């Protein structure tokens, strides 16, 4: 079964491609029935229909016409495979033949360009922290000014700058600089802000219709958002004239920085005039919030920033209060249909751990860099505005993902950058048991891109111990993903993907053969990361171990109490090592990482597809030598040899490691001697391959060039399986890794032992 082909066509990968026929049987499988779905996956041959989709008339279904529907040409009707309702086809579908079938009856994934145009262009609201040092602020200003040329000419733009006060800039005046100034230590409310900025009191009736488009006047709230083509010169001038915060910072104190208040004011201004309109709040922060709501740390330097240990031991003084503030703000921003992006440019933590819900529930970007002057920030920020072949931004707005299922399936939840859509009546295909964001069959993505991938989990409805599937035709479970969104071209679009999975009785060998161990590993990793947000890290590791043992007991071949007889079929053989590397990954092992770094790593992991997620779990290692062609090698200390160059890709950084002998030759300058042209080309090969990896990676990875004995070689050694550690003898020519971590060999040996002994 070609799992990757299905992903290329439909953007979906299931853990089990054949489903057990009952819930009891599915529970025995240990790994839940789930899939990784990339709604806007790029395809050259995507079927695009320039008309509205045909929708099922059942008000509780509303699924879309697809290739699995039964068509009755004589009566011009179609039967919905999801709910079995019979529907009348539109008149222009009459008299169709096998040769003239519409796109939606021949393609499992179709994109519809609907007839409803987008009313308001996207809004980009920049929030700039001016407490940055001069060099850092200068680099940031240059990046923002450059990015203006990448925005659509009709895009609306706004600007807030802040230190311990918040300045909301009015771009409507070309001759003078006007701005409204707010206190940074206060949490403003919507009615209060509207009255201050417009002079009008906001009553309940106005609050309901607050998003009604109004003409821009000198006193209207929407005067703060004007078309880029009108105000680009003014905005560029304002940015160029920005100076670092003029307030004196006393010795032993941090700058006063009202980040929480700035974000709150930005969300309120947008809510006041552009609720449920595509908008991005883009924050550039150069340090932690030290004043006002959402305060991360006090201004005094003697008060250190919280660590993981402080958070776990409940001794992080401001953490819970800040999290509560930002979580409530995130819910409000998501409800308004807006997105928050956070770009950090400083060596210190800025409070990403507290603010992560702002980006994770709105489809925003969280980027952690050392400074705004680094290549990582500059190039990642510009890639944020990357465009497709037609010149449109590769970002979609106001997305909604609805998942329709046939009566055999219910939805447990979704793990990804989204928020639940609140509905008046609960959909019939929603399970009582939740994984991730549950209790609904529709999720809201204020923003999404071709990279965004969501983990969706299902429950088999039939509770029977072993439901027999005894029919002439194979029993199929149908799932339809309907993604509605605003395309950056100004059109409303609907991407529909419909898939069918066979259901068989437990024990049928087709179920085991349908196991996609790569997708399963990523789905289980997403559950583990989701659990790690609220559970103790050691408990999450134990849960991972127990599920692996149970899966092996179910699907490995072995004789009881005989570890040497343990065998896993090819469909399962890589799964244990994925689990081993997941246990050691920065997503679960937070030792040596700050809370902000952990938030950043988990944010990126929960938005990427199967391939990129696996690179994060188990990095790839490629060996280059004079004797052999470049080849993948084990992520193991035995792969480190004096006469090879290694290329490590962890997704977050790309490292080139020169073995001891290679490093000596390089220092001696052999590559500059024409006699050693082969050696010169050997040094260039990994750089060329690294450049290939960097082409479309977001965010831009850190690039490390090191050698045996170099200080940065630790970045490689920390990722390797320590089969040669100080506790064991080293293989000749390999490297000893100084660690107390269990090696993969010992991990597998213990797994085999507990599996064959019947332990859990």
UniProtKB/Swiss-Prot annotation:
Gene3D superfamilies tied to this protein: beta-sandwich domain of Sec23/24, Sec23/Sec24 helical domain, Severin, von Willebrand factor, type A domain, Zn-finger domain of Sec23/24
Membrane association type: Peripheral membrane protein
Cellular component GO terms, alphabetical: COPII vesicle coat; endoplasmic reticulum exit site; endoplasmic reticulum membrane; Golgi membrane
Binding-site residues for Zn(2+), renumbered to this chain: 56, 61, 80, 83
Compartmental location: Cytoplasm; Cytoplasmic vesicle, COPII-coated vesicle membrane; Endoplasmic reticulum membrane; Golgi apparatus membrane
GO molecular function, one term: zinc ion binding
Pfam family of the protein (one): Gelsolin
Keyword Metal-binding: yes
Key words, A-Z: Cytoplasm, Cytoplasmic vesicle, Endoplasmic reticulum, ER-Golgi transport, Golgi apparatus, Membrane, Metal-binding, Protein transport, Transport, Zinc
GO biological process: COPII-coated vesicle cargo loading; intracellular protein transport
InterPro entries: ADF-H/Gelsolin-like_dom_sf (IPR029006), Gelsolin-like_dom (IPR007123), Gelsolin-like_dom_sf (IPR036180), Sec23 (IPR037364), Sec23/24_helical_dom (IPR006900), Sec23/24_helical_dom_sf (IPR036175), Sec23/24_trunk_dom (IPR006896), Sec23_24_beta_S (IPR012990)
Residues of the signal peptide: none
Family the entry assigns: Belongs to the SEC23/SEC24 family. SEC23 subfamily.
Quaternary structure and partners: The COPII coat is composed of at least 5 proteins: the SEC23/24 complex, the SEC13/31 complex, and the protein SAR1.
PANTHER family named in the record: PROTEIN TRANSPORT PROTEIN SEC23
Described purpose of this protein according to its UniProt entry: Component of the coat protein complex II (COPII) which promotes the formation of transport vesicles from the endoplasmic reticulum (ER). The coat has two main functions, the physical deformation of the endoplasmic reticulum membrane into vesicles and the selection of cargo molecules.
Stated name of the protein: Protein transport protein SEC23
Encoding gene (name): SEC23
């Amino acid at each position: 079964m070609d799992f990757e082909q299905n992903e290329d066509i439909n953007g979906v990968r299931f853990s089990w491609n054949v489903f057990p026929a009952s819930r009891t049987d599915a529970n025995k499988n240990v790994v839940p029935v789930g899939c990784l779905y990339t709604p806007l996956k790029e395809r050259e041959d995507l079927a695009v229909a320039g008309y509205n989709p045909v929708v099922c008339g059942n008000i509780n279904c509303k699924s879309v016409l697809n290739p699995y529907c039964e068509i009755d040409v004589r009566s011009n009707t179609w039967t919905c495979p999801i709910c079995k309702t019979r529907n009348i086809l539109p008149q222009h579908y009459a008299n169709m033949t096998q040769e003239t079938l519409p796109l939606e009856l021949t393609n499992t994934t179709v994109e519809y360009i609907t007839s409803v145009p987008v009313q308001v262009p996207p809004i980009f609201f920049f929030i700039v922290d001016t407490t940055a040092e001069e060099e850092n602020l200068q680099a940031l200003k240059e990046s923002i000014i450059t990015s203006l040329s990448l925005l659509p000419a009709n895009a609306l733009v706004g600007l807030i700058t802040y230190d311990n006060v918040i300045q909301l800039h009015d771009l409507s005046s070309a001759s003078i600089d006007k701005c409204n100034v707010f206190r940074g230590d206060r949490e403003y409310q919507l009615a209060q802000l509207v009255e201050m900025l417009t002079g009008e009191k906001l009553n309940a009736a106005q609050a309901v219709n607050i998003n009604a488009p109004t003409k821009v006047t000198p006193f209207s709230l929407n005067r703060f958002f004007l078309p880029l083509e009108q105000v680009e010169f003014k905005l560029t001038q304002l940015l160029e004239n920005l100076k670092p915060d003029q307030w004196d910072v006393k010795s032993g104190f941090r700058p006063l920085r009202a980040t929480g208040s700035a974000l709150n004011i930005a969300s309120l201004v947008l809510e006041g005039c552009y609720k449920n309109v595509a908008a991005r709040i883009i924050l550039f922060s150069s340090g932690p919030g030290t004043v006002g709501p959402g305060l991360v740390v006090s201004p005094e330097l003697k008060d250190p920033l919280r660590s993981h240990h402080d958070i776990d031991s409940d001794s992080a003084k401001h953490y819970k209060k800040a999290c509560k503030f930002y979580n409530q703000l995130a819910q409000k921003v998501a409800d308004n249909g807006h997105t928050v992006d956070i770009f950090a440019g400083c060596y210190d933590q800025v409070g990403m751990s507290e603010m992560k819900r702002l980006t994770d529930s709105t489809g925003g970007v969280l980027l952690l860099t050392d400074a705004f002057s680094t290549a990582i920030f500059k190039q990642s920020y510009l890639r944020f505005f990357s465009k497709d072949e037609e010149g449109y931004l590769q970002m979609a707005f106001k997305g909604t993902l609805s998942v329709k299922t046939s009566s055999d399936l219910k939805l447990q939840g979704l793990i990804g950058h989204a928020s639940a859509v609140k509905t008046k009546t609960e959909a019939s295909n929603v399970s009582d048991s939740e994984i991730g964001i549950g209790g609904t069959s529709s999720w809201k993505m204020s923003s999404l891109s071709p990279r965004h991938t969501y983990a969706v989990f299902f429950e088999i409805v039939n509770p029977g111990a072993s439901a027999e599937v005894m029919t002439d035709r194979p029993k199929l479970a149908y799932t339809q993903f309907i993604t509605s969104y605003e395309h950056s071209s100004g059109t409303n679009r609907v991407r529909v993907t419909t898939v069918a999975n066979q259901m068989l009785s437990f024990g049928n060998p087709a179920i085991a053969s349908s196991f996609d161990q790569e997708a399963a590993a990523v789905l289980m990793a997403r559950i583990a990361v989701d659990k790690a947000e609220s559970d103790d890290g050691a408990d999450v590791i134990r849960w991972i171990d127990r599920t692996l043992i149970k899966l092996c007991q179910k699907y490995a071949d072995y004789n009881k109490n005989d570890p040497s007889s343990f065998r896993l079929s090819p469909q399962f053989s890589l799964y244990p090592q994925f689990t081993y590397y997941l246990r050691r990954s920065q997503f679960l092992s937070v030792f040596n990482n700050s809370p902000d770094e952990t938030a950043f790593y988990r944010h990126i992991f929960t938005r990427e597809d199967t391939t990129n997620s696996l690179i994060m779990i188990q990095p790839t290692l490629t060996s280059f030598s004079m004797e052999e062609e470049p080849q993948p090698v084990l992520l193991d200390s035995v792969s480190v040899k004096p006469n090879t160059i290694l290329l490590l890709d962890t997704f977050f950084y790309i490292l080139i490691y020169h073995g001891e002998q290679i490093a000596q030759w390089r220092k001696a300058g052999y590559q500059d001697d024409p006699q050693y042209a082969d050696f010169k080309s050997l040094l260039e090969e990994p750089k060329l391959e690294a450049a290939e990896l960097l082409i479309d990676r977001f965010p831009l990875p850190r690039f490390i060039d090191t050698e045996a004995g170099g200080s940065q070689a630790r970045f490689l050694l920390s990722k390797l399986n320590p089969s040669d550690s100080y506790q064991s003898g080293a293989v000749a020519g390999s490297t000893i890794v100084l660690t107390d971590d269990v090696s993969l060999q010992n991990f597998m040996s213990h797994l085999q032992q507990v599996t064959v002994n019947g332990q859990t």
